[in-house]
Amino acid sequence: VLANTLPGYYGLAEGSWKHWCRVWDVDFDWIKSRFKDEKYMSKPGFTLSRWYEGVIQEDKISQYTPLKAVVFWGCSSNSQSQYHKLKKALDKLDLVVIIDPFPTMTAAACDKDNVYLLPSSSQYETSGSVTSTQRSLQWRYRVVKPVHESKDDYEIMRLFTEKFGFADKFYKNIKQIPEDITREINKGTLTIGYNGQTPERIKKHTDYWHTFDVDTLIAKGGPCDGEYHGLPWPCWTTEHPGTPILYDISKPVAEGGLPFRARFGTEYTYPGKPKESILAADGVYNPGSEVKGGYPEFSDVVPGTNWKTDLSQETIKTAIKRGMAPFGNARARCYVWEYPDKIPVHREPLHSPDKEMIAKYPTFEDKPDHYRVYTKFKSEQKPEWVDEYPIILTSGRLVEYMGGGAETRSNKYLAELQPEMFAEVNVKMANDYGLRDGDLIWIESPHGGKIKVKTKISERVDAKTIFLPFHFGGFFMGDTWAGKYPEGTTPYALGEAANVVTNYGYDIVTQMQETKTGLCRIKKA
């Protein structure tokens, strides 16, 4: 979930809101009236990594009121860094709602009233389209109806809209069925070419997956002949085969080829240089293109629209007929003029073990109103951190578990393979601290978080580093929360959440949390 854009990467500008209002067939002024102030329509919201600051306000927030409620819908709160601060936020909120097939660590974390668990069905109890990170789609068929007290996501959303009084607008032109929802996505998400993957086409690909070549992804014969498996976006029309590779000028656009997108205008003046074209050079184009070189994005085929906002999709169809990409043909951009660093520059982590590197490669200035919260960079990067916290801390995944582990740690077979939380410690570090394999240790962060975990001695980490898997939950700073789960739902595998001790640190552009480098100290428990 992105805090700075409407669906389909449309952003938050007025034109973007009006586009989606046309898709939904709702009045723009009604949408605007839902906001306390019009300025919040175009203001990025809190991100997943720092929403809790909107509650506890340890760093200054940039909105008229603190957050009062939170809904976790298939989201593991223990996947977020600074978890001990997130817990403070949970206990301060007026309302916490958890929608999940399993009671997550969030349910156990709340020491307050007004916490509601809404059991949702699993992927086997519902149907609909799903998209992979490879951009291909498939249709998920329901195996059984939702069991016990669970409801599928569609039903939960319907109940929400009815409770909040806008079901008539939410379902104005669609029914509460996945096929209609997919068609609405087809209609509105033109920016990335989601318009050609109709429910009927996706189902056909799922039903005839055996006709696709595993190497080329192309169907050989059958009803999907010549199409790429899953119709990877952009899939420009209902006749388009999908785009397996985003940049490929060896084949026509109509057959799955694409140039680079002309997303950043047609000209730019680089520092110390004259203005130059940033469209593709002459002679760089897809086979069959009417223009034998660069060209801008298509607009005004239908007056007053462009390829991203023309709901008739005539603009896209016209571009394809001319052998051209709707979004234009430009050069790859390696100089990103909107970013603080226009080209990649090394900046030392906020919590670095190397004082000389901090001096040589300092971080950014602090950033006020960074997704509605003041974010520290320079003021947080102190060379003296390493004097008290000399060990490098990193975290990552285990093959047996996924995300915060609520589902996978509730599987007894997976829990048997990885039953306990641990800290992976190098042999030399273990000997220096007098540790043996299986010893309990305390790990403390510079920000007040601490966890108690078992030592796993290994040569896979170096003598300066500790590794923590981030999937565990059910313990908090030495205390068990096993008894705080609803009866009969405690996961088989419990452990401290690594993100209690992951350090403060966020990306300057996206506000993604820093989980791969930080500092800590350890002592034998």
Locations of regions flagged by a protein language model:
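Hydrophobic transmembrane alpha-helix bundles
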Residues: 22, 26-28, 135-146, 204-222, ...
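Long, contiguous, secondary-structure-rich segments that constitute the structural scaffold
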Residues: 153-203, 290, 297-302, 306-326, ...
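Extended redox/cofactor-interaction regions of prokaryotic respiratory oxidoreductases
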Residues: 1-114, 121-129, 203-433
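Glycine/threonine-rich phosphate-binding loop and adjacent beta-strand/alpha-helix elements that clamp
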Residues: 116, 124-146, 161, 504
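Hydrophobic alpha-helical scaffolding
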Residues: 60, 75-76, 130, 142-150, ...
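Phosphate/diphosphate-binding loops
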Residues: 94-103, 143-161, 442-445
